[in-house]
């Protein structure tokens, strides 16, 4: 799993039929301070995240374990919206 921030949306009118109805988001991976950590991916959004939100992603076969993504050609899924990130007992991120 990796933490990222949704930075955009992908619109595709022609795609694999198994992806029809899936919301595609662009996610930039971030460190625990919210700074870019290198890496941008397109992910299927399973939780209704919006642009600017901090999210938790899963990749590889783990991305195909949600009811929305099972048996679909997906490599990365947004599986949670982060409300609070706590490191060593200190809150380093709180959702606005």
Where on the chain are the PLM-derived regions?
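Residue-level recognition of beta-strand microenvironments
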Residues: 6-9, 13, 46, 81-84
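N-terminal first-folded block
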Residues: 1-37
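C-terminal structural segments of small proteins and small subunits
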Residues: 56, 62-96
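A structural micro-motif recognizing beta-strand termini
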Residues: 30, 44-46, 60, 82
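A generic local secondary-structure boundary/capping motif
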Residues: 14-17, 44-46, 66-69, 92
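Short alpha-helix capping/helix-loop boundary micro-motifs
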Residues: 39-43
